[in-house]
Amino acid sequence: MFDMPIATQNPQTRPFSIVLLTYAAILAGLLAGAPMAHASGEIGQASGLPVPRFVSLKSDRVNVRGGPTKDHDVAWVFTRAGLPVEVTAEFENWRRIRDWEGAEGWVYHSLLSGRRTVVVTARSKDEVVPLNDGADAAAPVTARLQPGVIATVRRCTGTWCRISGPGFDGWAPQERLWGVYPNEKVD
């Protein structure tokens, strides 16, 4: 139907393209070995902070909107301060966030805090997560946490996190916490 080519290349620029691609491949190889805070390694245009990243809700009432302006309808309201959310995008003063159940929406940046928190997760609703006295499954159990408990992150080793909350402080397996990335270290 269409006889026009989608893209054409000038034969005179071909050697330049090969050199450029070679340099790009070398640079990509060097950067692949560089440590990155998160899988994508992107920096948010609005904040200058990594995207994605975990933050927490500052308030007991946070409107989540369908888009990044007050003109967009409120899709739902969070009613739990300290809940961890993942910032997945930025637009001016708005942050697209994802909660631990996978729901996504837009929140005004001042309603978010850089304080790191986690939600305790379990493989079933009846399962509890042991909180140990040390970063070791053999360490004494100091508490058992129900799924949905919110805790403050004190430190993560990449496999264990020291967390605390009202009436508890100890170490939990990092894989059982939503609000920290796999293998992420937090000091």
Labelled PLM ranges:
Residues G33-P35:
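N-terminal signal peptide c-region/cleavage motif recognized by signal peptidases
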Residues D73-V74:
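Beta-strand-rich domains and repeat architectures in extracellular enzymes and scaffolds
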Residues H38-G66, V77-A81, T88-F91, R98-W100, ...:
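SH3-family beta-barrel domains
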Residues M1-F16:
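N-terminal secretory signal peptides that target proteins for export/translocation
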Residues S17-A24:
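Sec-dependent signal peptide recognition
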Residues C161:
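Surface-exposed aromatic
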